[in-house]
Amino acid sequence: MVDLGKVFILGDSYSTFEGHIPEGYATWYYDVIQKDTDVDKVEQTWWKKVLDNTESELVLNCSYSGTTICHTGYSGDCSKASFVGRFDDIVADGWFSNKTVDTFIVFGGTNDSWANSPIGEVMTSGWTKETLFSYLRAVNYLIKRVQDLFPGVRVICITNCDLKPEITDGLRDAAERYGAELIELQDIEKRSGHPDIKGMEQIAEQVLNYLEER
């Protein structure tokens, strides 16, 4: 069985489930269905299936429905909820001061694609908050920041299917630049753009197949 050790997940709606993400974070999946989905048990989620089929311990599922990696979301500035914004907030709050992370999973980019967040240009140093409102700068910053904070951590990026090519290409480029891993999902079943039970099974299967081949 693949050993992932202590796992941190940074994601969007695809990785949420009510009661299993930080309080106040928006979710798509509930015990009592409230969205267009048939997923109503946490055991049906892709991430729980992956955890249950590996040697792993979840440190935190820091997933927030509707969020972009960069600071530009559907209504403009989303710097408090964005992937980089909330990760930086957790770091600044000292949450990691007594935590160990062996595997850091980033599953995002879907909302950057859907919200038409600015793509921008690659930036590999000198980031400021103002530079992180575009996707390419933010995704490079995020991967580098994680690696700097957790030397030797295994960073696994997951990208959705059917996104703008510049979103997928940008994540692939950033992963290659910093030695992170990338899983590119294929042909996932969805309802209203979100994986249903079958889609969750497909994501878990593709992730587990990737892990077992490494």
State where each predicted segment sits.
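Extreme N-terminal starter segment of soluble prokaryotic enzymes
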Residues: 3-7
